[in-house]
Amino acid sequence: MYQGKGTYLENYLDSISTLPSELGRNFALIRELDYRTSDLVEKIEKLKSNLLVTTNGTRRAVHELTDERASKHIKLEMKQVIEYSDEKVELSNQTYELIDKHIRKLDIDLKKFETELESAEEEKKKKKSKQSQNNSTVESSTTSSSSSSSSSSLSLSSSTNNTSSLNSSSGGGGGGSGGGGGGGGHSSHSTGNKKGKARDSLTSSSSSGNINGMSSSSSSSSSSSSLSSRKQKSMAAQDIASITGNNGDADVRVFNANPNDLDLAIDPNEPTYCFCNRVSFGEMVGCENPDCKIEWFHFECVGLTSTPKGKWYCPDCTRIKVKK
């Protein structure tokens, strides 16, 4: 556990609080022993001077008994000097060990503090790195959500614009088809009603899809909003053009839709056509029978590969005409 430099400093100061007094006591004892040793050495020197008398360069003993006593006295004093010296050495060793003990403790505490400091710094770096990663994840999620929202808004705006163009294009194409039919001599009341109904149903389909798309975009989650936007783009991308040949060709309606768009969810309000009961896509041909129940058919469902010449009737209406 990280204790902090303040804690280590307090503990160390507490441990050395008695050190000055201990050192002072030892030094005082050593000084006292020095004084005693000095006195003994001086005393021994005097005894030695009295023991040896030099006359004319020769040495002679004064009295045997006195010399023997003086010699024993000198030995005792020398022995005492040695004892004092041993005590001083012992006190010096104690003082050294006392100081060395505190130095070792200081080294151990410094090493421990350094290790704990490195661990604390490493843990702080890990926390900072983890916090940075979390912030990056949140920012990335926010950016992704913002991009998704912007993309959805752009898709909705594009779908609305395309749907408006679709409605105006459907109205203009219907008028052109009526004019072309009159010039070719094949325009009739039934055909006009039929085209008008088809235009109304297609326009209603586009408008319904647009309204449903905007409603689901505002009320559902971001995933359903994305699906609705894609469906709106698919429906709005169907470029509808009424083509009526000046030479009396059958009424053909072309839907430039991507076949992949058919895999998307179909709006239940969008009208269906043909025997297959599917929505409008690709090229479609209209039956000239005003009473036809289906009216519009996909080329592939009625076996057509190109625009038929003249008037065209669906298989059901053809059988009815043959019977009549």
Swiss-Prot record:
Mutant lacking the gene: phenotype: Cells provided with nutrients proliferate slower than normal. Upon starvation, the progression of differentiation is delayed in a cell density-dependent manner. Cells form tiny aggregates and more aggregation centers compared to wild-type cells, resulting in a higher number of tiny migrating slugs. Cells form complete tiny fruiting bodies 3-4 hours faster than wild-type. In a similar manner to wild-type, most cells remain as non-aggregated single cells in the presence of caffeine, which is an inhibitor of adenylate cyclase activation.
Stretches for region Disordered: 120-237
KW Metal-binding (keyword) present: yes
Keywords: Chromatin regulator, Growth regulation, Metal-binding, Nucleus, Transcription, Transcription regulation, Zinc, Zinc-finger
GO molecular function annotation: zinc ion binding
Zinc finger (PHD-type): 271-320
Amino acids binding Zn(2+) 2: C287, C292, C314, C317
Single Gene Ontology BP annotation: epigenetic regulation of gene expression
Biased composition, class Gly residues, residue ranges: 170-186
Keyword Ion transport: no
UniProt-annotated site: Histone H3K4me3 binding, residues: Y273, M284, E288, W296
Localisation: Nucleus
Any single Gene Ontology cellular-component annotation: nucleus
A Pfam family recorded for this sequence: PHD-1st_NSD
Signal peptide feature range: none
Protein family: Belongs to the ING family.
The record's note on its domains: The PHD-type zinc finger mediates the binding to H3K4me3.
Subunit structure: Interacts with H3K4me3 and to a lesser extent with H3K4me2.
Role: Involved in regulation of the growth and differentiation transition (GDT) process, probably by regulating gene expression via histone modification.
Protein name, entry field: Inhibitor of growth protein 1 homolog
Name of the encoding gene: dng1
